[in-house]
Amino acid sequence: TLDVAIGGSINDRITNSTRIDSKNASLKYANVFNLANIVMSSSASIDQKIDAHYQLQSVFATAQIGYKEGVFLDLTARNDWSSTLAYTKYEKKGFFYPSVGVSFLPDKWVKMPEWVSFSKLRGAYSIVGNGVPPFITYPVSYVTAGGEILASDAAPFGEMKPEMTHSVELGMEWKFLQHRLGLNLTYYRTDTYEQFFKLPALAGDKYAYRYVNAGDILS
């Protein structure tokens, strides 16, 4: 048997935010956080206004191949284009991440004792990509109250790479005595690479911070 699915998606998100400095730091009613509930003073002002537009475009495909109802091969592939990776080499090509999984049902191929009701062996390898927050690859300035321009304190990182998580999973499942007793064992390992960090810049740098890709988290 062969089952195939192909698709695409667009995640488009627009954020408009306004920060108001009331000069009083108090609310009319406790724990009600909206502009109308702020106690304003005569010197209150709009401290900062930030607008952000984020878009993630994706294409993906899945396929499952089955053989004699006893062996199954599952394949997936996905490519994402994230607006937060603009001004990097991933702006045009995006980032690709696949997965492959195999499951085998021994009882479909080998005659099992009557007390064995079900048996399954499985294994999978996958890669999952993740973009970065906005305003990392390109510096952004904000206009504050009084017309002051607040520049970004971190250098643009044009070499930014998407975070990637590699996973391996092996397992088995057995059912005995007409499914009254079961055994399910799983081994998995995940490695996350290319995390991004905001680190203090060297003395004399025109920026206070710089971004780097680093790290390897194993679980």
Regions found by a protein language model. Give the residues of each.
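Extracellular/periplasmic, surface-exposed regions of secreted and cell-surface proteins
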Residues: 1-219
